[in-house]
């Protein structure tokens, strides 16, 4: 681990275009970013959209170590989204790419632009299941990840090969 680096988790999702390929490309773009090292991808999963219509999502989570400050990392995530044609038409709209900063080490961040830990991550199987692939012992404010997974077991999620 590099001194001054932080372990970061980012959720990735897409349900328009070649969704899985988009996620793989976005992960490679993140891995190639100065200040980001040791990027690991969870499995890919298929899930139905939350509170909207449209095609099923492909979701995963990435873990990496990072020396970028959180706001600079957020800028990079949003730039990658835009490179892939992300438009923010309305909440939960179908999207070519969605990158959400879930955890930035142990930091608690609450600014106009950024809330970390992500405020709804503990309610979403499409975040918790791939997150558990990478961090099966993770403890969140709402409880151990294994306990949180029990609360979302009614949400349909399918691992892709």
Describe the residue ranges of each PLM region.
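N-terminal beta1-alpha1 ligand-phosphate binding loop
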Residues: 2-36, 41-48
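Short, structured patches in soluble enzyme cores that scaffold and shape functional sites
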Residues: 12-14, 66, 132
């Amino acid at each position: 681990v590099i001194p001054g680096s932080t372990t970061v988790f980012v959720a990735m999702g897409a349900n328009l275009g070649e969704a899985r390929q988009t996620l793989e490309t976005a992960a490679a773009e993140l891995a190639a970013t100065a200040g980001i090292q040791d990027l690991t991808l969870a499995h890919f999963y298929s899930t139905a959209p939350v509170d909207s219509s449209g095609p099923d999502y492909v979701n995963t989570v990435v873990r990496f170590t990072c020396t970028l400050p959180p706001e600079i990392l957020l800028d990079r995530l949003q730039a990658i989204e835009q490179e892939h044609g992300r438009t923010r038409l309305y909440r939960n709209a179908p999207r070519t790419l969605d990158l959400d900063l879930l955890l930035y080490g142990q930091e608690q961040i609450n600014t106009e632009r950024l809330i970390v830990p992500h405020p709804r991550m503990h309610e979403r199987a499409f975040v918790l299941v791939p997150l558990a692939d990478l961090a099966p012992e993770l403890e969140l404010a709402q409880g151990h990840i294994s306990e949180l997974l029990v609360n979302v077991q009614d949400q349909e999620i399918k691992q892709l090969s």
